[in-house]
Amino acid sequence: MFYIQSSEALQILKNSLRKHLPESLKVYGTVFHMNQGNPFKLKAVVDKWPDFNTVVIRPQEQDMTDDLDHYNNTYLIYSKDPKHCQEFLGSSDVINWKQHLQIQSSQADLGKVIENLGATNLGKVKHKQCFLYMVSHTAKKLTPSLVDAKHLVVSSEKPTPFDHQLFKFARLDVKHAALVNSIWYFGGNEKSQKFIERCIFTFPSVCIMGPEGTPVSWALMDHTGELRMAGTLPKYRHQNLIYHVAFHQVHTLEKLGFPMYLHVDKVNLTIQRMSAVLGHVPMPCTWNQWNWVPL
């Protein structure tokens, strides 16, 4: 087991992960931001170096003091050989199976290993799988072979403009975290609000302010570089505001050179249509999250 800490080693790791896109996307996005100052103070662990098979990105041990906070206790995993990484992932030095935690990966094949480890460590595993998209600009740069007409869903829909007298673009403030948390699918609790506050404070965000001077539609970015937690207040839905937020967010982050990707729930047809309008590229792999609760 090796810890990857220096900027030089992180760059080598990022370059290696790029060769395995899109399956390595979740870890690639995280390592990109680790090498841009590592604002979430994460660490990379590999089974061997430099010719690694499996890499795990996780918080520092001293930052994992709350055994019940799976938003903080998050592990990002990529393995070149997902069927034979169980011993490495089972090590307590790699993953603390005594805590509530979540594992995210662009590899569904890790599911069997995680289920086995869940049984070994006596706990419950809940799996959520979603569609995975890469923003077209990012896909053209990182995975040009996937940017092909046969992979794209062509949409002729055009969103209606919004009233710029009533609605204004802005950046979210930490004080808006409770509002975001109130309608986030994975949120709605005190620990998720702390995570949202940290994302708003650390990374660029976009919102549309409504007539009352509060956000009515928004989108954030998390510590893995994923575009997440987008939402619109029920009162303002069906006005295509989320499209304008997403479009503005992509162009803002594109100027910063960030790789951009996102997941969409398999039943969320509205955001799937929006992704088609925006030209997001659907990936052949999926977004996966496993929530683990020890008994």
From Swiss-Prot:
Keyword Transmembrane tagged: no
SUPFAM superfamilies, alphabetized: Acyl-CoA N-acyltransferases (Nat)
Enzyme Commission designation: 2.3.1.13
Modified residues (N6-succinyllysine): 41, 48, 124, 128, 140, 255
A GO term from the CC aspect: mitochondrion
Molecular functions per Gene Ontology: gamma-tubulin binding; glycine N-acyltransferase activity; N-acyltransferase activity
N6-acetyllysine carried by residues: 41, 43, 48, 80, 83, 124, 128, 140, 150, 255
Catalysis performed (reactions): an acyl-CoA + glycine = an N-acylglycine + CoA + H(+)
Domain of life the protein comes from: Eukaryota
Localisation: Cytoplasm, Cytoskeleton, Microtubule organizing center, Centrosome
Subunit structure: Binds to microtubules.
Recorded family membership: Belongs to the glycine N-acyltransferase family.
Protein name per UniProt: Glycine N-acyltransferase-like protein Keg1
Organism (species): Rattus norvegicus (Rat)
Gene that encodes it: Keg1
